Amino acid sequence: MWFKNLMTYRLTKPLDWDLAQLQTQLEDCQFHPCGAQDQSKFGWSAPLRGSDLLYFSVGKQILLVAKKEEKILPANVVKRELDERIESLEQKENRKLKKVEKQTLKDDVVMNLLPRAFSKNQHTALWIDTENNLIHVDAASSKRAEDALALLRKSLGSLPVMPLAFANEPCTILTNWIVQDSLPHWLIALEEAELRGSQEDSVIRCKKQPLENEEILALLQDGKKVVSKLALEWEDTLTFVFNEDCTLKRLKLADSVREKNDDILKEDFAQRFDADFVLMTGILAKLTENLLGEFGGEKTRL
């Protein structure tokens, strides 16, 4: 349940989050495992183990989990089987097969292999902050986040969202933090960053290297590079990598934070899940608020 990434989206129009209605809407897109001939399945699964509800809610915070099952068919296995069939049929009919015939054979090969294929399961969590009209997705890529949002849009019928963007250019703020040693008191820069130049391939990745290094500072001060990614620690609570597209990657809560609810018995799984969700959302909501303030608020949309 602990988020490892944070891609945040602004609801451009408030929605009515009636939970009974939400459950009904989610059930229309509920996850069902792949059948023998299915290559993939995508739908909602229960966030809380053993629950029939396809959402988990505490106060004004809602958690959803999109589950995707994909059959794994290695390309070399499909190719080997297909090549054998093509060769056999071409010899039998004494002619070269047309492109459309080869595609038909390939589809047949895939259908025959699917029942024997292994499955890969992927879960994507969405945290809906109805109080602040934000949706946070635990995804490391935009595609994965957009897929989950598309599923929610399909369930609700409408989902007016845009990626959260800050008013001030993030790379300018990040660069100034390092050059001017002006990080806010609640943040500590760790020894990891990515410096980007004007050319797309002109990237320097720094790891386990003090960012006050003279060479790094010279590049930034001369305007040859800007900081596009920066590893940070927030109030001894968590570490993360801030990206210039306003996404947070590699979120890691401190052990002391994750252990705060250890007094709850393991048998009380639902109570522990509830407490951990409240803890996590409280921390990440505060961090989001802090970052918005530091980056000049939210970018005005035209």
Question: What is each stretch, according to the model?
Answer:
Residues 1-302:
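Intrinsically disordered, low-complexity, charge-rich terminal extensions
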